[in-house]
Structures are given as structure tokens and as C-alpha cells.
Amino acid sequence: YVNGGMHENVAAAREAVDAWRRGKHSEGVAGQVIQYVSAHDDLTLWDKLCASFAAGSLGSTVAEGVNENTVDVPKVMYDADFSAEGLAGVGPQIAAALTDVMDANKLAVGITLTSAGIPFMLSGEEFARTKFGSSDSYDSAKELNWLDWNRAWQKRDLIEYYAKLIALRKS
């Protein structure tokens, strides 16, 4: 839903937001459902969105099950600097794709944190954690799996967005 097919998947998204309590997949109560968009397995949310939007914005097509082998994602998308100078330095196509990625990230967490059910997030998701497109980092260098605290500082606006959504959920 977040990275494409919005109109085709709106009914499924509504059912998910309501924790599948009404309809053919009724699970009972919201507390029985974990809502998430990324976990420690597979791509991080940021990497998945980079792959999806790089494909759509840069001219190729998004394959089913996007991963690092299906889309050639420019490294600059993973390392994105969202300052005006940073976006100006990557060219208009990549800057547009990065803006779409950030908007989709916010939509994804907005859906997760305002949905019925128990929210779950990958550590570092709040600052656009990346494993640079690696969908299976189990045997990778430890630096790939570490949390990048410099990135957290650089993406503090996104952290603030997550914090506001968490506060809204608590209220």
C-alpha cells in the first residue's frame, strides 16, 4: 500500500488498520495483532522504500518481492542528506525519489502507530536505518547491523515525527 498499488489495496489496508476485526480474516481482539512494516529479517523499511521508489522514479519497474537483487538502488539514496544542499547535490530525479521515500516512511509509521493492535518497530527505523540493501545481513560485517548514531542525529526530524505519533497513540 505505502510503496505502490494504493488504489488496488485500499480495502486490505483498511482491514489491516482495524486489526482484522471485521471481515473474512477476523482475528478477534486488537491485542492479538502485531502491526509492523519492518523487522530484523529482510530489508529495513528504508531500504525497501528506496528500492521501490528508485525503481518507479528512475525508470525501471518494481518486481514482486523487491530486494537488493531486483533493483539497482543508487547508494546516495541510502545515505541521503535531506538538507536543501544535500538534495540539490543528488540531481532532480533522485531528490524526487528521496522525497517520496521520506513521505512513504512517514505514511507507513503513521498507519502502524494509529492502527488497532500492538505496534512493533525495527530498532533504528525511527531514523531511517539502512543495511544498504542487504536483505540477509546475518553473515555480514557487524558494522552493517550496528545502529548508526550519527545517522540518528542527521535524521532527528524523522525521530521527532515518530515521537509525536507515539505521543498521539499514548493520549
For each feature predicted by the language model, list its residue ranges.
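Active-site-proximal helices and loops of the catalytic beta/alpha 8
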Residues: 1-28, 127-164, 168
